Every structure is written in C-alpha cells, then in structure tokens.
C-alpha cells in the first residue's frame, strides 16, 4: 500500500438523515487530514465522499437492468419501497431525479408491529427470537423458553403478520397509491421484512391489476449471492442477500464511475 492515496466513499443514509451529509463529510475529511498509522507506517488519505439516500442502490440496479434491454429509466417514474425492521421508506424518482414530495421514511417497521402483536398474544420477550424464527421459516413449531418445551406459535404468528399487514396496507393506500396515477410508474419492493409479506403483497397487487408494475428484489446478482454465502451470519439470517441488495447496487454504481477499476 502506498503511503499516500485517494479514497472515494459513497455513503447510504436514511432519508431523514440526508441533511447531515455535509457535517459527516466535513468530519470524515478532517479525520483523514490527520493521517493514519498502519503497521507502524504513516498513511495519508485524500477522501472524496458522496452521500445518497438508502434505496438509491436499488434504483441503480434497476437502471442497469433497463439499459441492458435498451430502455431508459428516465422515461418512467420509479418508486423504491423498502420494508425494514425499523420503518418503511419510499423513494420516488421522476425523470431520473429524486422527488422529495413523493419520498418519505415514516412508514411502519416490522419490529414495532411485531412487539405489539406478540405482547397482545401473550408471548414474552425470551420467546421473541423463536417467534421470529417461526415467522421467517413459516414453521410454527419452535422451542419456547417460557414453556420449556416445543410450542406451536401459529396464533402469535398470525397475529404478528396480520398486525404488520394492516399497518403496511394503510400506509400503501395513503402514501403510495396516489403516486400510481401515471401509467409508466414502476414499483420496486425490497427490504428484509418484504419477504414476510411476499404472498400477501403479490395477491394484493394481482387483485388491483398492478402485478406487471410491481417488482420484488428477490433475484440478486450472482456475485452478491456468492459474497453472502461466505458470511457466517447468512445461515441464521436467510434475508441477508435481500438486505444487502441496496448497498451492493450502490457499490456497483461507485465502481462504474472509476475508470481505473474493472467492473
């Protein structure tokens, strides 16, 4: 490694924290100006940093897919829906630009809905992990710490899914549905919690006649799948590839801007 080099950093920030990007950049540049020590050798780093909203990597992924078949993403409206454990976010891109008026990150997250429903169903905190495993695997028979035996979590599973679904449905109808007035609008659904409601979402969009305009980011690039398989956490977190799709798209976008690095 040379004693002095340039580093390019693309950072994904939650939509509500995007306003802090200048402060983050200033602080990061100040840290780099002070230099580093690596194995006793001084290192000087020149940092170039850009911040993007979480979900922009998914947009770049779709942009690349369309370009591969001769289509231009700028000719359509693209809604990126990210269903996370903390919240649900929507990014609206119109003509290739982020439209702030159609974007927000105040939708319901899976975890708050899960906790609410689990408590109402009589599940205590020591069993939260096993209830989560039941939902993720669709296998209701799981170990219960509170009961000291195998337990059928069918009723709590249904309660959690119903509670989350109703919250997502309300948000969709209030925040996303009005943006579908343009016939060239495409919706891309991702996030670690999206797989939990996959069947319900598919049935809902089919009923509305929207199935051809809604895409699920279930098929990931082979390189990403290979990368995730090498991580020890992947066995315990089946949705890890789905969770990493956004950051991987951002990484590929960054690599594509660097002439000196082979894509």
Where are these regions (language model features)?
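Alpha-helical context
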Residues: 4, 93, 97, 140-144, ...
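Short C-terminal domain-edge/linker segments immediately following a structured domain
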Residues: 39-44, 82-83, 110-113, 121-123, ...
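C-terminal amphipathic alpha-helical segment
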Residues: 115-177
């Amino acid at each position: 490694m040379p004693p002095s080099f340039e580093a390019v950093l693309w950072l994904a920030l939650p939509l509500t924290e995007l306003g802090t990007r200048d402060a983050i950049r200033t602080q990061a540049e100040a840290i780099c100006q002070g230099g580093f020590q690596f194995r006793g050798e001084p290192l000087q780093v020149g940092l170039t940093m850009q911040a993007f909203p979480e979900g922009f990597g998914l947009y770049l992924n779709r942009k690349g897919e369309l370009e591969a078949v001769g289509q231009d993403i700028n000719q359509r409206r693209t809604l990126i829906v990210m269903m996370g454990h903390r919240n649900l976010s929507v990014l609206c891109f119109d003509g290739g630009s982020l439209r702030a008026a159609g974007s927000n990150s105040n939708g319901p997250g899976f975890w708050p809905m899960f906790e609410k429903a689990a408590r109402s169903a009589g599940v205590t905190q020591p069993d939260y992990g096993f209830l989560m495993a039941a939902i993720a695997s669709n296998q209701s028979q799981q170990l219960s710490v509170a009961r000291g035996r195998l337990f059928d979590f069918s009723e709590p599973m249904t309660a959690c899914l119903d509670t989350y679904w109703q919250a997502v449905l309300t948000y969709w109808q209030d925040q996303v549905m009005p943006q579908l007035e343009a016939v060239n609008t495409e919706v891309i659904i991702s996030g670690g919690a999206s797989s939990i409601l996959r069947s319900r979402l598919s049935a809902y969009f089919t009923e509305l006649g929207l199935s051809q305009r809604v895409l699920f980011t279930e098929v990931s690039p082979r390189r990403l799948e290979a990368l995730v398989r090498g991580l020890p956490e992947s066995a315990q977190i089946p949705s890890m590839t789905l969770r990493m799709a956004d950051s991987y798209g951002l990484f590929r976008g960054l690599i594509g801007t660097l002439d000196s690095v082979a894509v």
